[in-house]
């Protein structure tokens, strides 16, 4: 066979013309730092494993000790959680640089103070599996149970379920099992590209955000790796400079992999600090979490063939459509739980399904839905704290460009309306001019409370339908 027919690998990818990433603020490159938090989840007979750990430590070429504890190896890993993590935490928080943590669930459970610090810093915590072990020969049903248990422990310890998954020491089944779990916005067990890409999974499209084994401090613990911090810095700088130069035409992402027990050592940490400062000295750089990258890609780069809601996992569906109804993702969740079909793969069909889901809400939920909406040309608009959708909608009707007299009139009508009904005036402004909106205020102020509640809910459905039409593909 000379072609790709029937060949299960994609050797072509984006080819000679990759998509234009469109990172925020015209960034040439997205530089993303990952801290792997594995200490306390590694192979150890205390954890029910057959032997001691032998991977990624100061003891290059170490071998497992069957049935025995390896005290030197244990203390090397302990350095990562006791000292190395906190050095990295200070380094990134002092510079206000976002981080994604690949956190092993059992390691998280053994150092909740570190997890609290991750949350306090606003870092993304993705799951790094249940245990930091080699899954190569693990039966798929066992690995699936481990993934499920990792999500359970992670959610309990971190306070929220992980939306990213990186097993690391993976099996041939890992990626499929991650896609089957259904709750991950991205999987990262790939090193195949400089950009995210879509795979068609067993439950619909799955975003892959490739990771790195080259721009990674693990090479301090590998043959022919980095022997000094200067080598690490030079490699990271060359990687950044190349991608920054390319990025004016074809922006990419640069992942940097870190380990608390490796680069957390003082002699290596200095080189990392120099590199972070070097990146910060450039203007057109975006420094996101991996979840930020995934969400950006989902918004701007749908999978081939566009979005088919009936083929989306609940997590991806809510990510895409959870903001269709203002601050009310429960409507998207209810619509997905009710079951989606080919009929809902159009904007009109999905709008009907989501309106039906909203109608199923309790009176309290509907009241909260109405209250979730901002005043038109109100204080939130002036403070520029509206949602992206509301900002665009109000701008389309010219409500961001009011004269002082117009602003005073809108303010008076907003106040009068709230005083009468106890909730904000809601109208699908994309359908209307400023004059239409002002006339609507005057007309609806005469309604009774029940009629106006029904009118507000109908307008909310109309707003949602218009938003759905604006979603690409």
Question: Which residue stretches match the model-derived regions?
Answer:
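A structural motif
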Residues: 202-219
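Aromatic-anchored, charged helix-turn/loop surface patch used as a conserved interaction hotspot
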Residues: 323, 329, 333-413, 463-472
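Residue-level signal for inorganic ion chemistry
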Residues: 328-329, 425
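C-terminal amphipathic alpha-helical segment
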Residues: 221-232
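C-terminal non-catalytic interaction appendages of large macromolecular assemblies
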Residues: 402, 406-473
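Catalytic alpha-helical scaffold of carbohydrate-active enzymes acting on polysaccharides/glycoconjugates
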Residues: 2-207, 233-256, 262-305
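Charged, compositionally biased N-terminal leader segments and the immediate start
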Residues: 306-326
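A non-catalytic, amphipathic alpha-helix used as a structural packing/dimerization or gating element
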Residues: 87, 145, 149, 235-238, ...
